[in-house]
């Protein structure tokens, strides 16, 4: 549980980059 909360509070850069690329690539 704490792990998920931490991930939401402070997402890792690797995950953020993946989301940014997906969002930018997805029209």
UniProtKB/Swiss-Prot annotation:
Q: Drop me one GO molecular function for this one.
A: iron-sulfur cluster binding
- Single biological process term from Gene Ontology: nitrogen fixation
State how the cofactor is bound. Binds 1 [8Fe-7S] cluster per heterodimer.
Cofactor(s), names only, from the UniProt record: [8Fe-7S] cluster; [7Fe-Mo-9S-C-homocitryl] cluster
State the function annotated in the UniProt record: This molybdenum-iron protein is part of the nitrogenase complex that catalyzes the key enzymatic reactions in nitrogen fixation.
Name of this chain's protein: Nitrogenase molybdenum-iron protein alpha chain
| Keyword Transcription attributed | no
The subunit field of the Swiss-Prot or TrEMBL record says: Tetramer of two alpha and two beta chains. Forms complex with the iron protein (nitrogenase component 2).
UniProt record similarity statement:
Belongs to the NifD/NifK/NifE/NifN family.
According to its UniProt record, the EC number is 1.18.6.1
* Broad EC category: oxidoreductase
Q: Provide the alphabetized UniProt keywords.
A: ATP-binding, Iron, Iron-sulfur, Metal-binding, Molybdenum, Nitrogen fixation, Nucleotide-binding, Oxidoreductase
Catalysed reaction, written as an equation: N2 + 8 reduced [2Fe-2S]-[ferredoxin] + 16 ATP + 16 H2O = H2 + 8 oxidized [2Fe-2S]-[ferredoxin] + 2 NH4(+) + 16 ADP + 16 phosphate + 6 H(+)
Q: What is the native source organism of this protein?
A: Methanobacterium ivanovii
């Amino acid at each position: 549980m704490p792990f998920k909360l931490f991930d939401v509070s402070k997402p890792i850069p690797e995950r953020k980059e993946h989301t940014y690329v997906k969002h930018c690539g997805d029209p």
